[in-house]
Amino acid sequence: MNWKAVLIFSVLGSLASCASYSEHAVQRIEAGKSFAVTGNTKRINTMACQDNDDWYLDGYRVGKSFREHQQKMLSQRTAYCEEQTGKAVPDKFRHSWNSGYQQGLKR
């Protein structure tokens, strides 16, 4: 391989690693591990995917402390639970999360 090819591959590799991050991109979350909410805030994943009360309480916490990340947090939780259960998240859980979120906004 000549120096031009090496230079081209190096530049392409650098550009690929600098791909922009979408504000609503879903981050991969693992059970019991922390995950980023913002650049300097993390949460620990203790999600109980089939527990309606857990969905409500998570929404409440997001509404109270992370309101500007509403869509991101709900998307992360939904993606995690769909991956864990292999099924779509029932609407009742999203409804509970949104109810909790609205209550959290009031606090």
UniProtKB/Swiss-Prot annotation:
Leader sequence segment: 1-17
Lipid-binding residues (covalent, S-diacylglycerol cysteine): C18
This protein's record includes keyword Oxidoreductase: no
Membrane topology: Lipid-anchor
Keywords: Cell membrane, Lipoprotein, Membrane, Palmitate, Signal
Residues with lipidation of kind N-palmitoyl cysteine: C18
GO cellular component: plasma membrane
Domain of life, per lineage: Bacteria
UniProt keyword DNA damage, yes or no: no
Subcellular location(s) per record: Cell membrane
Protein name as catalogued: Uncharacterized lipoprotein PM1897
